[in-house]
Design a protein with these regions (language model features):
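Oxidoreductase cofactor-interface core, primarily capturing Rossmann-like NAD(P)-dependent enzymes
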Residues: 1-45, 59-62, 69-71, 80-87, ...
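Periplasmic-binding protein-like
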Residues: 75-77
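Cofactor-binding loops of NAD(P)H-dependent oxidoreductases
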Residues: 55-56
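A hydrophobic C-terminal alpha-helical subdomain
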Residues: 2, 229-300
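N-terminal glycine-/serine-/threonine-rich beta1-alpha1-beta2 phosphate-ribose binding loop
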Residues: 48-49
Length: 300
């Protein structure tokens, strides 16, 4: 075990996914510090209850040195589809090692060695940097996030259908990122996951499975449909460049041809319980839409 109340730096602490790590660390008596990119994000981080906020840039080694100094552990998830993602990840690993950080939890991606997908392969150099460091690393390789369904939820409710740009019977591995966050917190506050590399999924689900769960929870039929990639992008209004969209299109092309494999064995073992199921996640979304059940946590 680390010392009581270990100091943990959460990089990008106000992001859609990194923020889930903060309450899990706090439940384990960690003192959470945040690295964010501007004053507006700093205010959000403080509202989440962190003890200290650093404003910095993953491309600025001085800010990384300042943020990692005196920390017992670091949680890191890289910015998606960024051209220099690998370099930024290596920089935070090197800063952590130079400053004597003990533990490092990296939220990578399932199947990073699928080098046909450049955004998957961009995690490999970061993993290699950890393997070649003196840090007690834990590498988390999560599947497709269930929270992506949550992002589409307003449209699902409004239009009564859910679309992704691959066939509706194709199964892909999905995971509730809150479970990934819990594993990260365990890794950063205990020793049992030190030097583990873990594929994290709750199981494999098709879009037919997703809409069946939604229909059951809402009590009305929801349709699964297959938009083209361009139609899906236009509907999703993603804040990505043309190059980032190209990388994303390759992921969905892979899903179309091969699906995405994964099982819940590693996640169940790491959590010491069954992971949150697809039905559990859908049920929470449905309750958020019910005015009689306020105050539930949202994905964003």
């Amino acid at each position: 075990m680390l010392l009581n109340q270990p100091k943990i730096l959460v990089v990008g602490a106000t992001g859609k996914f990194a923020r889930w790590v903060i309450p899990e660390l706090m439940r384990r008596d960690a003192v959470v510090h945040a690295l964010v990119r501007n004053d507006a994000r700093a205010a959000v981080a403080r509202s989440l209850g962190v003890a200290e906020v650093f404003i910095g840039d993953l491309r600025n080694t001085d800010s990384l040195a300042e943020a990692t100094r005196g920390m017992d552990g670091v949680f890191y998830i890289g910015p998606a589809f960024t051209p220099d993602e690998a370099a930024m990840g290596i920089a935070i690993v090197e800063a952590a090692e130079r400053n004597g950080v003990k533990k490092f939890a990296f939220s990578s991606v399932i199947q990073p060695t699928n080098t046909r997908l450049k955004n998957h392969a961009s995690k490999i150099p970061v993993e290699e940097a950890l393997y070649s460091s003196r840090l007690e690393y834990t590498i988390l390789q999560p599947a497709n996030f269930m929270q992506n369904i949550g992002i589409a939820w307003p449209s699902i409710i409004l239009h009564g259908r859910f679309g992704e740009p691959f066939p509706k019977d194709i199964k892909i591995a999905r995971v509730d990122y809150r479970d990934v966050a819990e594993v990260a917190a365990i890794a950063l506050t205990e020793d049992k996951l030190a030097f583990a590399t873990l594929e994290l999924a709750a199981g494999m689900f098709s879009r037919n499975d997703v809409v069946a769960a939604i229909s059951a929870e809402l009590g009305r039929p929801i349709e699964a449909f297959e938009p083209s990639f361009s139609e899906w992008v236009q509907s999703a209004r993603l804040p990505y460049s043309e190059q980032q969209m190209h990388l994303l299109s390759k992921i969905h092309e892979h899903y179309r041809n091969y699906g995405l494999g994964g099982n819940s064995l590693s996640l169940t073992a790491a959590l010491g319980r069954e992971p949150r199921s697809l039905r559990d996640y859908i049920r929470e979304l449905a309750r958020q839409n019910d005015p009689s059940t306020p105050h539930l946590a949202k994905d964003s």
